[in-house]
C-alpha cells in the first residue's frame, strides 16, 4: 500500500495517523509540492484533481482522504473506527463530511493563507468559516463530552483533527 503525500497536508496526515494507530505499514511517497510534482502528467494519471493524498492499494488508486480512512478502518479496525450499524455509521459519517466541508473550507484554507500566503484576499471569509467550524465542534463536544460521535474515538476525530489541532 502506497500513500502519495506531502508532510504539510492535513489530509495526508489524517491517513498517516489512522495507519499508525492501527499499525498498518504504508509506503510513503513524498510528492515535491513546491516544484508542482502534483501537477505533473505522471501524478495526474493517479489523481486528475492534482491533489494529495493518493493511495495505491493493490494497483487500484483512490484519491480522497475520506475514502482512505474508510478503507483502513473497515479492513483493519473492525467495528471500532467505523461501525456497520447504519445509525452509528451515519453519526460518524456526518462528522467526516463536516471535516471535508466546514473544517476544510474554513480552517484548512485559513491555514493556507497564514502559512503559504495563498489567496490573502479571501482570508476574512476563511476566518469566518473557521469560527463557524470551531463553534460547531464546541457545541457538539459540550453535548457529548470528549468525542464527536458514539462516546468514543472514531473516524470522526481522525477526520477533523489535522486542521483543529
Indicate where each model-derived feature is located:
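Short, polar/flexible loop-turn hinges at active-site or ligand-entry regions and domain interfaces
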Residues: 76-85, 116-123
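Short clusters of hydrophobic/aromatic residues that line enzyme substrate/ligand-binding pockets
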Residues: 43, 80-82, 147-148
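GST-like fold's C-terminal all-alpha helical module
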Residues: 96-165
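A basic- and aromatic-enriched beta-loop-alpha substructure that forms the phosphate/nucleotide-
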Residues: 66-74
